[in-house]
């Protein structure tokens, strides 16, 4: 778990949620620096959450952000399991339907931004509704 110094100088532990929010904010800034436009963050639909929704041209991008301190056990990218992919697909499907769209009518893709230690990896089109 990451730590942050307090005003008194002694570190305090961040919650898992705070750590995740910090990495998601960093991923958002990083993607915006690459030219993507922010749409939404922490989108909850029945049974799942999408960390970031971005836009690149006419493409809607659903982004999963992952952080791991080290590359042990495959690093951050390897933690996006088949089960997690399925949940993300379902959540995106519900979000699209809420916004009058579907995988058939909206150009979209699923990206992963993986932070492993000090390294960042952007996996474009990491998976899709046909995988």
From Swiss-Prot:
Give one Pfam family: UPF0102
Its protein name is UPF0102 protein YraN
- For bias kind Polar residues, which ranges apply? 1-19
In the UniProt record, what gene is named as encoding this protein? Answer: yraN
| Region of interest called Disordered, as start-end residue ranges on this chain | 1-21
Family under the similarity heading: Belongs to the UPF0102 family.
Molecular function terms from GO: nucleic acid binding
Instruction: Please report the organism this UniProt entry assigns to the protein.
Output: Escherichia coli (strain K12)
Q: Which domain of life is it from?
A: Bacteria
């Amino acid at each position: 778990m990451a730590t942050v110094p307090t005003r008194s100088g002694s570190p305090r532990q961040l919650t898992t949620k705070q750590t995740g929010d910090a990495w998601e904010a960093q991923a958002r800034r990083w993607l915006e620096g690459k030219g993507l436009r922010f749409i939404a963050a922490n989108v909850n639909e029945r049974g799942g959450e999408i960390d970031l929704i971005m836009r690149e041209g006419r493409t809607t991008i659903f982004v999963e952000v992952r952080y791991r301190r080290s590359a042990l056990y495959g690093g951050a990218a390897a933690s996006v399991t088949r089960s997690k992919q399925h949940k993300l697909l379902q959540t995106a499907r519900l979000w699209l339907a809420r916004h009058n769209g579907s995988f058939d009518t909206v150009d979209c893709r699923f990206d992963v931004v993986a932070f492993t230690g000090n390294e960042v990896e952007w996996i474009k089109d990491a998976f899709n509704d046909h995988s």
